[in-house]
Amino acid sequence: MKKLLLLVPLVFTAPVHASEVTVGQVCKAASAAMFGRDHKIMQLDKVESGIAYVHYIRQNDGTRWAIKCKLVGDQVMWASDNPDSIGRWRDDPADSTVKYAIDGKKIIITELYSDGSSTTNSYPLKQLK
């Protein structure tokens, strides 16, 4: 009697526990937190070379406000990106520090101020698409 040896490749898969979060989603959440606006009005214009460009229209006067941001570790680096005032990257020690974290299906944005105080806001990932 001949024996047949069957070789079956084993494939191991690991479940994905963390959500895939884009720089655009983080930038929209950070903009809402920093400027005290509803995250639902934040619009992602584009992502180019790891930099997200986001804007919103201010309701009371219809003006357009825009920023660009990039992620450096858990920090959100940002600069204004308005046609008449393209600003500097907020990386001076006197600037507030904006950090992000992912908690399940939420993005948590924490802004740490130079006086030691901070504010924290949470946004549902699915509303930042």
Summary of predicted features, one role per range:
Residues 19-41:
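Short, non-transmembrane alpha-helical segments in secretory-pathway proteins
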Residues 37, 62, 116-118:
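A cross-taxa feature marking solvent-exposed loop/turn segments within ectodomains of secreted
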Residues 48-89:
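Mature extracytoplasmic domains of secretory-pathway proteins
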